[in-house]
């Protein structure tokens, strides 16, 4: 599968004197991006194999190279002339004192360094902080629907059914039955993600943690916080899990790129509201596997997929809140997504269907209360031709939104 969006980011950042840090959930294709796609690009542009130093640190055979002094000596021994060397380190967080190693590599005048990592606690936070102005992060998401469709083709609605059930981890494409796909996703939780989180955080109660993950999977698109989740455990699960532990567990999930938090934003007051947030899964197949594929609700999943699509396009995405006042009451209306990038902003509603005027009014109510000039978009599941409604809002179909990345600019 071509991953041109990310490959172009790597190509444009060549020789920029920064460490290129490719982050993303385990099994999302980081190694393939660097060791295959980027490697092939280097060869095609005339770089010789002996000037590409590649080390997969999660390979047992390279266990000795997780020692900082050993790996630095290994790299220095392979640099034998003044030509430029491309150094590619996969799962760099497995090196002891890896920030010191990266600092040392920055001092090699004829080296261009690329690393991958699958834990943001060690990477996005530590590395980007440690290498202020010297680190260039590229976040790799699982396959988008467009990447999948452009590679596989076929009936887009049949592919959509598969996508909203099994998600976009590249390993899914190698499996030829629904049973195998479901088993693969379930096993990833046990053998990869949970194992990583237990090891990195010295987690004692893995079942308690998995139970919280299942709760998060069942409430995508719902506003929550540790206090609300604590009450859920008491009332629904008849279990005690205090908010401090819940907050810690949520940070573990975010650090492993399993989930992302979208904060609530007061549109008119132009400030964040710190009480409740929404959480979305970076891969919808992993979310469904947590629930044994029992709650595959297309409307909620569609909202999650739209969130992921906006994020991979580079937007910061918040949940918008706007106040509606009448003579009798004041109530908060929600805008599903406030998507920001530089001076661009879009207000977006995910509307699975608008079968009647009441539903249409419900979806439009919050957008009507926003009095600025940024574009307001309602995305429907139906395959419709994009149009403006009487309010000046843009109504687009889900397929157009997912398959035409320039559509929002063109509306």
What is the predicted function of each stretch?
Residues 1, 32, 39, 43, ...:
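A cross-kingdom feature that marks ATP-driven nucleic-acid transaction machinery
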Residues 1-15:
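Pre-Walker A adenine-sensing motif
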Residues 22:
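Hydrophobic anchor at the beta1->P-loop junction of P-loop NTPases
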Residues 25:
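P-loop (Walker A) phosphate-binding loop of NTP-binding proteins
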Residues 53-82:
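Short glycine-rich substrate-engagement loop in P-loop NTPases that contacts/grips substrate
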Residues 112-118, 139:
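Structural recognition of the conserved hydrophobic beta-strand(s) that form the central parallel beta-sheet
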Residues 121-137, 151-153:
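Short regulatory helix/loop adjacent to the ATP-binding pocket of P-loop NTPases
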Residues 145-323:
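Interdomain hinge/linker elements that couple catalytic modules in large macromolecular machines
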